[in-house]
């Protein structure tokens, strides 16, 4: 029976382009996972959107002298194009500045307030006398009181992952003017997180399938003692509080952004013309929701969002899994947008194809510890693995069939033990590799699939059809038939990671249907419209296609084309110099 799988993906702040650190830790893993489940015929809903609110957007707007809406709409549009080019197949990628999201977020806030889970309290907050304003979270930087990191933000330390209150920073400084702000009293709303301690601990105990890094972080976070969390801010840009007399305050972005998973599911439902179908993913206890995030977002998704759901409506499904990734570094340093030490995805895709990037980032995915992107690693992976092990294998099989078997799948004779051994190994790989994809062990799935590609190379070298055909054409035909079935199967095993070239190989193997659908940019469902990204499924989806090849003899094959191109070694130094030049 098909499974119901929610793929809920972290919402990027719409204040700058996406860099490779973003896509390595969140978007490529989420898309790989979603594509696997679509190949299984499961019912998948993958949603996210641009985070349009919060101080990163207002800080960028003030720096440029434009409105926050100008900033978020600019980068929201760029996100849509980037995800489309990279093949990130969101069923819906929207943003948080929609009437639908306002409505859902305000309903949750109001309900929690009426139930007593949100209360008002006077708070000490940093105030800049020079700028004459309170300084919410990212308007302040300083030294982390826990790890000593000198550039911690007022809401979180990127070094140790702790959530912070700006008032706790050592030597705080205003990001607008650089001066030291002073503490002042202001009234704010707080979420009573301690009220959920027992329920959160019970929930955590059931999540034995979570990654160890996530389990340990959450357990330590709860055992350190939960504290009420502020849920309002003194800003003009954001979602107004739905409490009479407090409409001049807005919701704290960490509180309302996670609500986007629910509101985006509802928006997708509305766009589909089935206003209630979102409940299949949110109320059916058999449905499973997977949240793809970076490790810095663990507390918001593993503690705060579950608590919001518990307090708002206990019939809503809590996160089933949170496969949070560690961080990706770049050429020996952390990614830094302020220093421009980053590889921006639009820039990368202007020079290189998407599948080699997806392949390399999967091979170095920071699943359990930080990892590193290097240009040398990218070039070597492209040339020595993707091209040499997989691309060349496909090309030499297809060109041989085109040249010596009139471009048709050869008619095999009786298969011998070596033929059966290879096909049995690949058939067994569907269960083993499928289980790895399902457990979000994507590096291991890729490793196993590439190991099978090496087995096919060994098989060809042993059988040597280029020699067989001189003396026994039937034996060569059998070898090529087995090899074609092998690469047809491997095409599926690698398709979640390599959607573009797997689709290309699907056509080269004579198929007329498609593995995957289209990713389109179109108006959203609200009057007046806002642009969204939508995945339009292929006609072949909805059934389980995760099975070994049944490619039939006699099928005509189109002229072969190479799947990948070799990268020159000179690329390494050229790209390193480009990176150094832009970061100066």
From Swiss-Prot:
GO terms for biological process: methionyl-tRNA aminoacylation. Its main location: cytoplasm. GO terms for molecular function: ATP binding; metal ion binding; methionine-tRNA ligase activity. Residues 541-563 are annotated as: Disordered. ATP binds at residue 337. It catalyses: tRNA(Met) + L-methionine + ATP = L-methionyl-tRNA(Met) + AMP + diphosphate. A motif ('KMSKS' region) lies at residues 334-338. Its cofactor is Zn(2+). It holds the Pfam family Anticodon_3. The keyword Secreted does not apply. GO terms for cellular component: cytosol. InterPro entries: aa-tRNA-synth_I_CS (IPR001412), Anticodon_Met (IPR041872), Met-tRNA_ligase_1 (IPR023458), Met-tRNA_synth (IPR014758), Methionyl/Leucyl_tRNA_Synth (IPR015413), MetRS_core (IPR033911), MetRS_Zn (IPR029038), Rossmann-like_a/b/a_fold (IPR014729). SUPFAM superfamilies: Anticodon-binding domain of a subclass of class I aminoacyl-tRNA synthetases, Methionyl-tRNA synthetase (MetRS), Zn-domain, Nucleotidylyl transferase. Gene3D superfamilies: HUPs (3.40.50.620), Isoleucyl-tRNA Synthetase, Domain 1 (1.10.730.10), Methionyl-tRNA synthetase, Zn-domain (2.20.28.20). Belongs to the class-I aminoacyl-tRNA synthetase family. MetG type 1 subfamily. Is required not only for elongation of protein synthesis but also for the initiation of all mRNA translation through initiator tRNA(fMet) aminoacylation. This is Methionine--tRNA ligase. It comes from Thermomicrobium roseum (strain ATCC 27502 / DSM 5159 / P-2).
């Amino acid at each position: 029976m098909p499974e119901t799988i929610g793929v809920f993906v972290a919402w990027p702040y719409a204040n700058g382009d996406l860099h490779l650190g973003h896509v390595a830790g969140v978007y490529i893993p989420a898309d790989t996972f979603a594509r696997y489940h679509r190949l299984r015929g499961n019912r998948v809903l993958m949603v996210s959107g641009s985070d349009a609110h919060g101080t990163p957007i207002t800080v960028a707007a003030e720096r440029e002298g434009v409105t926050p809406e100008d900033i978020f709409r600019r980068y929201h549009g760029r996100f849509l194009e980037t995800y489309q080019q990279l093949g990130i197949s969101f069923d819906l990628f929207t943003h948080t500045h929609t009437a639908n999201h306002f409505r859902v977020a305000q309903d949750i806030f109001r309900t929690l307030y009426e139930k007593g889970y949100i209360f008002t309290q006077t708070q000490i907050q940093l105030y800049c006398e020079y700028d004459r304003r309170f300084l919410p979270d990212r308007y302040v930087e300083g030294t982390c009181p826990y790890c000593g990191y000198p550039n911690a933000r007022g809401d979180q330390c990127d070094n140790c992952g702790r959530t912070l209150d700006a008032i706790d920073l050592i030597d705080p400084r205003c990001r607008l003017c650089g001066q030291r702000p002073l503490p002042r009293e202001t009234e704010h709303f707080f979420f009573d997180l301690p009220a959920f301690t027992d329920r959160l601990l019970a929930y955590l105990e059931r999540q034995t399938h979570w990654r160890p890094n996530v389990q340990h972080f959450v357990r330590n976070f709860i055992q350190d003692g939960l504290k009420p969390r502020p849920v309002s801010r003194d800003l003009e840009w954001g979602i107004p509080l739905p409490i009479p007399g407090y409409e001049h305050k807005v919701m704290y972005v960490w509180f309302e952004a996670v609500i986007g998973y629910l509101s985006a599911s509802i928006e997708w439902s509305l766009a589909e013309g089935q206003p209630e179908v979102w409940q299949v993913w949110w109320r059916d206890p058999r449905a499973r929701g997977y949240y793809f995030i970076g490790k810095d977002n663990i507390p918001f998704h593993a503690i705060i969002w579950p608590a919001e759901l518990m307090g708002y409506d206990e019939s809503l499904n809590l996160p089933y899994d949170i496969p949070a990734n560690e961080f990706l570094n770049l050429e020996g340093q952390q990614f830094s947008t302020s220093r421009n030490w980053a590889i921006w995805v639009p820039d990368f895709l202007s020079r290189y194809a998407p599948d080699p990037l997806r392949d390399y980032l999967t091979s170095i995915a920071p699943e359990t510890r930080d990892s590193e992107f290097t240009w040398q690693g990218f070039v070597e992976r492209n040339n020595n693995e993707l091209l040499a092990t997989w691309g060349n294998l496909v090309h030499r099989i297809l060109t041989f069939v085109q040249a010596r078997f009139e471009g048709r799948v050869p008619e095999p004779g009786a298969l011998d033990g070596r033929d059966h051994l290879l096909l049995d190994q690949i058939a067994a790989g569907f269960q083993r590799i499928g289980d790895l994809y399902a457990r979000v062990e994507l590096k291991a799935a890729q490793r196993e699939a590439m190991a099978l590609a090496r087995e096919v190379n060994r098989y060809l070298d042993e059988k040597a059809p280029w020699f067989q055909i001189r003396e026994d054409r039937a034996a060569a035909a059998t070898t090529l038939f087995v090899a074609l079935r092998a690469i047809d199967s491997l095409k599926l095993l690698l398709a979640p990671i390599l959607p573009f070239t797997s689709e290309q190989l699907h056509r080269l193997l004579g198929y007329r249907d498609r593995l995957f659908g289209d990713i389109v940019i179109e108006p959203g469902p609200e009057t007046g419209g806002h642009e969204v990204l939508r995945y339009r499924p292929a006609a072949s989806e909805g059934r389980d296609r995760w099975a070994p090849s049944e490619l039939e003899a006699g099928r005509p094959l189109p002229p072969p084309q190479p799947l990948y191109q070799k990268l020159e070694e000179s690329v390494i130094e050229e790209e390193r110099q480009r990176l150094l030049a832009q970061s100066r």
